[in-house]
Amino acid sequence: HSVKYLVLEKFLFPKLSDYSEIDELLKKKGVMTWVNCPRRMWEGYEYIKSLIVPELPVEYTFEGGEWGMCCNTIHFVDIFMALNGAASFEFCIDDLEQEVVDSKRPGYVEIHGTERFTTANGSVLRLTSTTAFDGVSRSIIKNGNNIIEYFEGKGEIVVNGELKNVPVHYQSGLSGILIDELLEKGSCRLANYEQSASYHVAYLSKIAPFINKIKGWTSESCPIT
């Protein structure tokens, strides 16, 4: 049996050279491939997307404590890019702490500090992870006259002070929807491999040397899960 559709989990691959090799293989085999960063499927983000004025930049900020920055940055990058519509971004690591810590998952690493992503259309994503954080984690999205706060874990979106309740999504509830979309339409709402791989490569090409330098490693791969 030949494979028609493939959905890969993030973080895609730890080595930069893997991305082009896999891309060639998928094209050679004719396999349509997406990457499972599912916020694009969330009702809350679809609602926020409907409020975005596409001609104006998106300013997206998320701050939390111990939320697994290395592991989960790509999720925020993916939805940020979906909201602002740009094709690529610049990634700044100047405000990261010069320390690499062990991840909760054995054999992997984590970082703290602030990551900043900017696009040619003036959009900015700021992600902050601090051990001292004791507030309520939320995404703050500014665009035009709108200030939007999204409390993902509570299913609450506040737009200019007005509360809207949205479903809290779990992967168990999204997998069936995703399969139905693929079988019925031959496509889905996730980023395709080419899009997501470009985000992964842009992130990994900065974060891998940063981590390897601090750890004194000479490997070309980086243990991000």
Language-model region placement:
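A general structural motif
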Residues: V3, G30, E55-E59, H112
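Rossmann-like NAD(P)H-binding beta-loop-alpha module
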Residues: E43-E59
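Rossmann-like dinucleotide-binding domain that binds NAD(P)(H)
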Residues: E59-D134, E194-A197
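A structural signal for well-ordered alpha-helical segments within the folded catalytic domains
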Residues: S20, W42-E43, C71-M81, S172-I177, ...
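NAD(P)-dinucleotide binding in Rossmann-like oxidoreductases
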Residues: R105-E110, R116-L182, S187-E194
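C-terminal helix-rich "cap/oligomerization" subdomain common to oxidoreductases
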Residues: H1-K4, D180-T225
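N-terminal glycine-/serine-/threonine-rich beta1-alpha1-beta2 phosphate-ribose binding loop
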Residues: H1-K4, Y19, K27-K28, V101, ...
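Beta-strand-loop-alpha-helix segment that lines the small-molecule cofactor/substrate pocket
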Residues: H1-R40
